[in-house]
C-alpha cells in the first residue's frame, strides 16, 4: 500500500517510539493508527474508524488530558506528537515531532494526579545492595535509599506511593511478581552508562559539584532516573531540592501487610486512619499527612518538636481558627511550582499562586504571635512575585492565552492597542459609517464585510451622484455599488493581522512572566513545604480537640501505659466505644489475649498499634493518658486471606507473614498477632502458635500482643514471667451473650462461637446440632496434657539465626 506523505510521516515517527501509543496531532484531533488505534478505541470506548484502510481512533485536542488520564491509569506509555509549525504558514507537509512521553510516573497535570498522594517514579539497581532512587516530578521531591535484601526493598516500596518502576533487566521478573498494578520498565544501557554521569546529575540540580548531595552508592541509580526523565519530558530535567537520604534509623518500619491490616490508608472511604485525621485545608497538607502516617519518626527530639507545635495550636484556639481560615485560600503551590519549572504552568496555576501569596503575610503574622513558631520569621512570602502577578494577570482571566483576556489592561501598551483594535472594531465601524453619512449626505450609506471582498461602503444607485472623489469602486450589484477608501483599507489590513498579533503578544508576555517566576521556583517550594507542615500540625490540633485526644509522652525504660485508650477509626463509626487500659514493660512484655468472637480482641490490638503510630508521627492520641516507648518497627498480622492469583494458600501466606516478622523484629519492635495457626489442623496450629510465642519471648524480647482462640497458649504464662494472660469480658444473661468489650486479666473460658452463629442468623436446627456436637468433643484434657510435657527448655536454647527473608516461605 502506497502511503500518503502524512502517513509516511506517522510511520517514521512511530518507528522511534514502538513501545508507546503514539497520539498524532491532525488539526483539532490527536489520532492513533493501526494497533495503537485498536488499544485506544477499546480502552477509551471510542469508535474505531479507518483512513487509507488503516484503523484509526482519535480524541479532541482540547480534551486530551481527559483521555490521557485513562490511558495512563491502564499503565500505557503515551507519546504526544504535536504540530511544531503553524499549518497556515507551512510549506507542504506540516512538521510534527514528539514533544513529550507520558507515563504513570512522569505526570505533571493536576487533572491526571491524585491530589492526596505523591506520584513517585522509582529506579532500582543492584550491586552489593539494592539501590533505589525516587522522584515525584509533580512536587519536586526525591529520595535515595539502599537495602541489603530484596524483601526489605519491596516492603519499603509498598509504603511509598510508587506509580512506575524502572529497573535493570535482570530484576524485572522478580519485581513484577511482587509489585502488582505498577508499571515496570527495564532501563536501557544508555540510562546506566557511567560516562558523564556526574555531569548529568549536576545539570539537574544546576550545580557544579555534586559531592554535597551525598549520593554515594546511589549515584548510578539516580543518574539513570534523571536520564529517563529528560527523555520522557523532552526537556532538561531540573530539581530544586537535593534528594532526601533515607536511613534505616529515621522512620518506623511498616510493611505493606501491616499498612493494610491496620487500615492506615486506602480501603473503604472513612474507614482508615488517614480519612479520620485528614481535615487538612490544602492538597499539600493532605499529601504530607499521608506521608507522616506511613513514615512515623524514630527520633524522639523530632517527634516532640511536632507534638509541641500541635500543643501550641490546641492551647491557642484563636490562633488555630485563624490559621485554618487563612489556609482555605492556599492552593497547591508545590505542584504549581514544578509546572512553572517545566514550562507547563496554566493561567489557573498563576491565579492560584497569586491567591496563596496574598494570604501568606497574614499566616506569617498570626504565627509569630505564638512563641512556638519562631521559624515563621524566616519565611519569605515572595512579595515580588505577588506584585508581578497582581500587576499582570486579570482578576478573573480567561483560561485561554491569546485572546487578550489574561493580561491586565495597562500592563503592556502594544497589547492594549491590539485589544482595542480587535474588540472595539465595531465601534470604529459605527463611527466611520456615521461620519461618512454626515460627510456625503447619503442617509442609507452602509459599511459591511464579506470574506471575499473584505470591508466595503455600500451606496444605492439613487445616491451615486453624491460619491466623494476618494471612493474607489470595488463591486457592482443590481441596485447598489460597493466602494473602498484608504482609511477603510488601512483598517482592514490592521484587522487581518491584529488577532494574530494579539495572540502572539499575549503569549509573549505570559511566557515572560513564567520565565521570571522560574528563577523563584526554589523559594516557592520552600514556602509550599512550610504551609503544608502548618496545615498538618493545625489539623492534628483540630482533630485532637474535636475527638478528645491527649498528648502522649515517651519512656526510655520500655514502659507502655495507656489509660482509656480508643480505636481512632472504630470510635467514629459506632455510637458508643468502650475504652481500655494497657500496661506493659520490659518484664511484662507479652500478652496472650483470649476472648470470644465479636468481643473486640482485634479492635483492641489494632488500637495499640494505631496509638503508637499516631504518637510517633507527632499526633495527639485517643486516650486519657499515653506513655509509650519509641518503636523501631511495628508489625500487624491480622486474620487470614487467600491469594488465588499467585497460587498461595491461606496458610502459606500466613506463615510467610509470620516468618517475615520473626526475621525482621528487634527488641524495640511492637508485634500484633491475630489468630496465628488457624489455617491448618488444630494440633499443628496450636504447636506453631506456641513455638512462635516462645521464640518471640525468649529470642527477641519485643512487645507482643497475641490474640487467639487457642486457650491452650495461656499455659505459657505459667512458664514465662514475661507473658501475661488477658481476656475480653463477656456475661450471659437470660441465655443471651453480652459483650462488654472490656480487656481484663484472665483467660476466656469459651469462645461463644455457637452463640455468635446464632446472632448471625443460622437456622435453629443447625445451632442445636452444633451444641450437641460440642458436648461430645469439649473434653480437651488429653491435648492439654500433651502440651504441658513439651520441653520448653529445648526451645529456649534456640538461637536466632540469620536467615535471608527470601527464605521465609521455607520457614
Swiss-Prot record:
<dbReference type="GO" id="GO:0003684">
    <property type="term" value="F:damaged DNA binding"/>
</dbReference>
<dbReference type="InterPro" id="IPR007695">
    <property type="entry name" value="DNA_mismatch_repair_MutS-lik_N"/>
</dbReference>
<keyword id="KW-0227">DNA damage</keyword>
<dbReference type="InterPro" id="IPR027417">
    <property type="entry name" value="P-loop_NTPase"/>
</dbReference>
<dbReference type="InterPro" id="IPR036678">
    <property type="entry name" value="MutS_con_dom_sf"/>
</dbReference>
<dbReference type="InterPro" id="IPR007860">
    <property type="entry name" value="DNA_mmatch_repair_MutS_con_dom"/>
</dbReference>
<dbReference type="Pfam" id="PF05188">
    <property type="entry name" value="MutS_II"/>
</dbReference>
<feature type="binding site">
    <location>
        <begin position="595"/>
        <end position="602"/>
    </location>
    <ligand>
        <name>ATP</name>
    </ligand>
</feature>
<dbReference type="GO" id="GO:0006298">
    <property type="term" value="P:mismatch repair"/>
</dbReference>
<keyword id="KW-0067">ATP-binding</keyword>
<dbReference type="InterPro" id="IPR045076">
    <property type="entry name" value="MutS"/>
</dbReference>
<dbReference type="InterPro" id="IPR017261">
    <property type="entry name" value="DNA_mismatch_repair_MutS/MSH"/>
</dbReference>
<dbReference type="Pfam" id="PF05192">
    <property type="entry name" value="MutS_III"/>
</dbReference>
<dbReference type="InterPro" id="IPR007861">
    <property type="entry name" value="DNA_mismatch_repair_MutS_clamp"/>
</dbReference>
<protein>
    <recommendedName>
        <fullName>DNA mismatch repair protein MutS</fullName>
    </recommendedName>
</protein>
<comment type="similarity">
    <text>Belongs to the DNA mismatch repair MutS family.</text>
</comment>
<dbReference type="InterPro" id="IPR036187">
    <property type="entry name" value="DNA_mismatch_repair_MutS_sf"/>
</dbReference>
<keyword id="KW-0547">Nucleotide-binding</keyword>
<dbReference type="InterPro" id="IPR007696">
    <property type="entry name" value="DNA_mismatch_repair_MutS_core"/>
</dbReference>
<dbReference type="InterPro" id="IPR005748">
    <property type="entry name" value="DNA_mismatch_repair_MutS"/>
</dbReference>
<dbReference type="GO" id="GO:0030983">
    <property type="term" value="F:mismatched DNA binding"/>
</dbReference>
<dbReference type="GO" id="GO:0005524">
    <property type="term" value="F:ATP binding"/>
</dbReference>
<dbReference type="InterPro" id="IPR000432">
    <property type="entry name" value="DNA_mismatch_repair_MutS_C"/>
</dbReference>
<dbReference type="GO" id="GO:0140664">
    <property type="term" value="F:ATP-dependent DNA damage sensor activity"/>
</dbReference>
<keyword id="KW-0234">DNA repair</keyword>
<dbReference type="InterPro" id="IPR016151">
    <property type="entry name" value="DNA_mismatch_repair_MutS_N"/>
</dbReference>
<comment type="function">
    <text>This protein is involved in the repair of mismatches in DNA. It is possible that it carries out the mismatch recognition step. This protein has a weak ATPase activity.</text>
</comment>
<dbReference type="GO" id="GO:0005829">
    <property type="term" value="C:cytosol"/>
</dbReference>
<keyword id="KW-0238">DNA-binding</keyword>
<dbReference type="Pfam" id="PF00488">
    <property type="entry name" value="MutS_V"/>
</dbReference>
<dbReference type="Pfam" id="PF05190">
    <property type="entry name" value="MutS_IV"/>
</dbReference>
<dbReference type="Pfam" id="PF01624">
    <property type="entry name" value="MutS_I"/>
</dbReference>
